[in-house]
């Protein structure tokens, strides 16, 4: 059995519904809009506007359906059982033209401070507003810009901020969790929270990729909401403004926690995990002790061991 998958627009999806045979639409799998049988082939239309035909002559049946609906496609997804990429053109999704949830995190590469994860819902209308406000890849923005921008967009967009503080981070590390697992759990939970906050239908959920989809789903510790609409994008901040917005809010939250550590310790600390961080950690050990240091840092980083060695010199 072969599978043929076509990526449709909203308008094309509606046309397909009109030409498909009537079928019972109760008890459909999550994310499925319509399912029927044609000439022994299973035809499934998803909420994500993907049309999948399963059967021996899936391509023939697919072309018949498209022709009947008056649709000519230049883009289609490859056969699910084929590794060939010849004669196939994959459409690059313009996420900002859709209602999207995007998620990203901050702090995962920093010895000091928590890990923050944010999911945000950005409608097509708000995407334009965020662009006017200057939302962009947060890696190109300084902390002051992040704070100013975050405080403008937080009231505008539905979002969920989750903070994994250092104590909880270290506890999960002791339980054998990797950072990838922590991220998967937090991203999935934040996305669920946002879905519960909004009433509008979501076209896509796009995650700034930190793991392949199979690994993400294995680690997420729960059902993946709107799985068929979920996409993973490398350098996602530059591809979806929903991810860029989440990145800004996540960095904003991280910066605020980072500033609180500086206030508590009276020591100017540095982001990242470089040699300067080792020296700063050693100063904190001298002032407050290793137990205190562990409450504001990620214990699994090598900076801890290096700081202890500096103390002994």
UniProtKB/Swiss-Prot annotation:
Localization terms from the record: Cytoplasm
Instruction: Locate the residues binding a divalent metal cation.
Output: 104-105, 208
Q: Which enzyme class?
A: hydrolase
Task: Tell me the cofactors it needs.
Answer: Mn(2+); Mg(2+)
- The reply on keyword Magnesium is yes
Q: Which GO terms describe its biological process?
A: DNA replication, removal of RNA primer; mismatch repair
Location (main, coarse)? cytoplasm
InterPro entries from the UniProt entry? RNase_HII/HIII, RNase_HII/HIII_dom, RNase_HIII, RNase_HIII_N, RNaseH-like_sf, RNaseH_sf, TBP_dom_sf
Q: Which GO terms describe its molecular function?
A: magnesium ion binding; RNA binding; RNA-DNA hybrid ribonuclease activity
Record domain RNase H type-2: where: 98-313
Instruction: Give EC number(s), comma-separated.
Output: 3.1.26.4
**Where are the coiled-coil regions?**
none
Q: How is the cofactor bound?
A: Manganese or magnesium. Binds 1 divalent metal ion per monomer in the absence of substrate. May bind a second metal ion after substrate binding.
Reactions catalysed = Endonucleolytic cleavage to 5'-phosphomonoester
Question: Which keywords appear in this protein's UniProt record, sorted alphabetically?
Answer: Cytoplasm, Endonuclease, Hydrolase, Magnesium, Metal-binding, Nuclease
Q: A single GO CC term, please?
A: cytoplasm
Task performed by this protein: Endonuclease that specifically degrades the RNA of RNA-DNA hybrids.
NCBIfam families for this protein: rnhC
Q: Which family does it belong to?
A: Belongs to the RNase HII family. RnhC subfamily.
- Can you say what this protein is called? Ribonuclease HIII
